[in-house]
Amino acid sequence: SNGGKEIVLTGVNIGDFGKSTGETFIDLIRALDKVEGIVRYRISSIEPNLITDEAIDFVACSRRFAPHFHIPLQSGSDEVLKLMRRRYDTTLFRHKIEKIKEVMPHAFIGVDVIVGTRGETDTCFEEARTFIESLDISQLHVFSYSERPGTQALKIDHVVDPKTKHARSQQLLDISDRKLHAFYEAHIGQKANVLFEQTRKGGMMHGFTENYIKVEIPYDHSLVNETRQVILEGWNCLLYTSPSPRDTR
């Protein structure tokens, strides 16, 4: 009712939607895709075991769902994933990434990882780092493990010291920087539709492409909450395809 054009689906285990009603996540996104007036939906933070191949195929063909996924991995070591009691392993995770890229080669995939968990030995971390490096993803969200009273993790003997946590975090952040740079570079010169936001900073405004590339231009109030086609010119820069931004509504 306020004129919003993009909705992000988020929550705790959104892939479990409908368990109490007999509905499924694919039922939800199919219904949302039919709602008029919404330009884009994004799927945020859905676990790999809960995003089905059917849902991935649907997003690839959808009129409104963006080719943008945020998928928690937490660790690229199967041993650590077992300690975390995750409902997936690295084999399943790799399959989901490869499936997304098969049907949406330009999809943006953000991945959550945690470093320094109890039980993450040097060997486990190296396995995780190697696995993450091998994935065709766009960006990592790296978090350092912190102790919480009363959790089962406190029963695990191996503790990672703060200095090692920081070093491991930095290694993964370096990987993230390289992957994001490569993802952006691959799109330079391409046309894209950008939905511009209201935020104004230093005389500039920004928006995002369907596959979550952030672009920046001089502030123009008439473009707020509007979608325009642009040519991606460089890092956070763009060149309009005509003297005036092209309306893609």
Regions found by a protein language model. Name each.
Residues I71, D112, I132, L140, ...:
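Hydrophobic, well-ordered secondary-structure elements that form the walls
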Residues G18-G37, M84-R87, E147-R178:
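Radical SAM enzyme [4Fe-4S]-AdoMet core and its adjacent flexible, acidic
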Residues P243-R249:
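A short, hydrophobic C-terminal helix/tail in secreted or cell-surface proteins
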Residues S1-D16, F69, T91-E102, E126, ...:
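Proteins enriched for Cys/Gly/acidic motifs involved in redox and nucleic-acid/cofactor modification
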Residues N2-F125:
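Conserved SAM/AdoMet-binding glycine-rich loop
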Residues K155-S242:
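Terminal RNA-binding accessory module
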